[in-house]
Amino acid sequence: MSLKITWLGHAAFLLQTETLRVLLDPYRAPDVGTYLPIDTPADVVLVSHLNPKYHSYWEAAVGNPMRLNGLDLSMMPEGIEAHGVRFRAVQVWESPARDVPVSMPYFTLDGVSVCHSGDLGHGLTADEVEPIKGVDVFLAVTGGSPTVPVLDLKAAIDLIRPKIVIPMHYQNGKINLSLRPVDDLLALFDPAQIDHHPSSELEVSPSTLPAETRVVVLPSAR
């Protein structure tokens, strides 16, 4: 068994096991730039917060999936179980002022734990890190302002100690936001820790996880 992770573009990912398809933070094309429409079947759509343009376009999923909002989950200590998976979230904030709540959803599929950093806009405290410490895969919002500054992101990664970091939410010529490129984050890592994957899909299983943190850069599928 393995978990297939596809970076669709911006903050959107499709996570697939043999029996389940989870869509994370789908955007609304063409309103976000030149990213193509997502239009993919899903069993669950999980969003970090409500922002239909960039993070919560429910209609990007084909079919009749369950809809989960990470902000709701963050208010439930046990989260919600759906399709045999326990979905939880940590409440964080969209800016250093900590005035607009967002969330970082986390869950485990096929033995691989995953956390999506949503629209995180600040450095993380030890209490905020605790529920996701040691997560296998961290989907990291990387483009800097208006989201978390890259130095604060690196500090958070050092606290979380994920096995794999997959950058997202950065400027790659497709998004119509003023974001920084992924190279700003990569410059803070040893080049030996960085993999530029040729495909937008990455297959991960508990037996293939690296011993130490690696950054895996995926091209967008859309």
Regions found by a protein language model. Give the residues of each.
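Conserved acidic residues
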Residues: 42-43, 136, 163
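Active-site-proximal beta-strand elements of phosphoester/diester hydrolases
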Residues: 4-7, 21-25, 84-93, 104-106, ...
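Binuclear metal-ion centers of metallo-dependent hydrolases, dominated by the metallo-beta-lactamase
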Residues: 6-8, 99, 164-222
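Pre-active-site segment of Zn-dependent metallo-hydrolases
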Residues: 12-77, 88-100, 120-131
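Active-site-proximal loop/helix segments of hydrolase catalytic cores
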Residues: 93-160, 177
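Zn-dependent metallo-beta-lactamase
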Residues: 1-18, 70-73, 79, 90, ...
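P-loop/Walker A phosphate-binding loop and immediately adjacent motor/lid segment at beta-alpha junctions
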Residues: 7, 57-90, 155-168, 187, ...
